[in-house]
Amino acid sequence: MRRHFFFAGMLAVGIGALGTGVAAGCGDKFVLIGRGVRVSRSQFPSSILIFMNPSSRVPAAEKDFHVEATLKAAGHKAVVVESEAEVQKALASGKYDLVLADVADAPALRKEASASASKPVVLPLLYKPTPEELSTAEKEANCMVRPSTKSRDLLAVVDETMKGRRNGTAAICDTAR
């Protein structure tokens, strides 16, 4: 009889200790901060250099649309650089398949990228372009990335470009075909 009360007492103490501690609510609650985002894994994971020129619109696009996080969630290796010196150093390493940059920086980056060992494709990023900028960009590039609320838009352009590159055909965004 004493043993029965002892085990009952120990059980009550154990439940009381576990029920009032930090672990009391584990797994039974969550906080919904925003809408969930589903990102499919890329069929063509790639190494992407993102040139976040402080004087361009890319930092604003990153803030609003989380470009780097979207790419990483899809299985890409995204690296952010903020200066031209960092871009040159990164391109010299020869590790990148794609360079994502503001539409204004793209022409100069194409020249640098073509001299790189890996010859990455430069994808121009358009964020809140003027009609003139949009028209000029459409003439210069076969494709471009426009941030949208749908992460699949960015990922579709990246995957299509990588598909062409991996198949040995001209990448979809190369200006010289």
Question: What do these predicted regions represent?
Answer:
Residues 47-58:
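Conserved acidic segment of CheY-like receiver
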Residues 21-46:
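Short N-terminal or domain-adjacent regulatory/targeting segments
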Residues 101-102, 120-129:
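Short beta-strand elements of ligand-binding domains
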Residues 98-118:
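Conserved phosphotransfer microenvironments
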Residues 160-174:
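The C-terminal output helix
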Residues 68-94, 101-107:
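A short, well-structured beta->alpha microelement
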Residues 8-17:
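Bacterial N-terminal signal peptides
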Residues 125-163:
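Output/docking surface of receiver
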